[in-house]
Design a protein with these regions (language model features):
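Jelly-roll (double-stranded beta-helix
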Residues: 1-239
Length: 239
């Protein structure tokens, strides 16, 4: 088993880098925008993992994306989406949105509330096909969620509500305190990045707390042990 980042020799436990833009408070796991760390470029096909907090009524105006799979997971509040292929939607916790940007798409993202902050994770995955037709979908994943399990809601095939143009599996769940769960990797040449949304867990002899992460590869399975009630996101990707 290897743990840590594929491109560095840093300690395995990865913390996020904070940036405050007033209306946007964001925490970057990997190099993004004004944050650059040559040791934190990507974890295999996982290129971006941003933890954003957007003030009421604020957001990102129309801007382009190309040849990237973009997954947005709202944690609190209302995420308002619009794009250049005529999609308009508002999604809330328990739902996700997936954009396959392909040969190009413009989109906007706003806090759909004028009163409360929006908290969301935005994740970019490098696709295994480029210049495809752009697509947008949103999905209700709440029926999949079962207490004390990591439920898989994105995969490369039709076994889950959502899929990506990549060998990528997204799983998430809320686990009770003092609980153990085993995560089994889907393929020999993938790695899994665990992101602790809330709580305190032990993974591969590392203690991880809220918004910490760790990447693991060269193993078939990993045990997650919780020290308190915890919400965990697992992103398994091609290396």
């Amino acid at each position: 088993m290897h743990k840590g980042e594929l491109t560095n020799v840093n300690p395995p436990r990865i913390t996020t880098e904070p940036f405050n833009h007033g209306w946007l408070k964001t925490y970057h796991t990997f190099s993004f925008a004004n944050y650059y760390n040559p040791r934190r470029i990507h974890f295999g096909a996982l290129r971006v993992l941003n933890d954003d907090r957007i003030s009421p009524g604020e957001g990102f105006d129309m801007h382009p994306h190309k040849n990237m799979e973009v997954v947005s997971i709202p944690l609190k509040g209302y995420l308002k989406h619009g794009d250049s292929i005529e999609n308009q939607s508002i999604i809330t916790p328990g739902e996700i949105q997936v954009m396959s940007t392909g040969k190009g798409i413009y989109h906007s993202e706003y806090n759909g509330s004028n009163e409360k902050d929006l908290e969301l994770l935005q994740i970019w995955i490098i696709p295994n096909k480029e210049e495809t037709e752009p697509e947008y979908h949103n999905y209700n994943i709440l029926p999949l969620m079962k207490h004390n399990e990591l439920a898989t809601f994105i995969s490369p095939n039709g076994n889950t509500p959502a899929h990506l143009l990549q060998d990528a599996w997204f799983s998430m769940g809320t686990l009770s305190a003092n609980h153990k769960v085993s995560y089994h990797l889907h393929k020999p040449h993938t790695g899994v990045y665990f992101f602790i949304i809330e709580g305190n867990v032990d993974i591969a002899d590392e203690n991880l707390t809220r918004r910490d992460g760790i990447g693991i590869w060269d193993t078939e399975s990993i045990i997650i042990k919780t020290n308190e009630e915890s919400q965990v996101l697992a992103i398994e990707v091609a290396l």
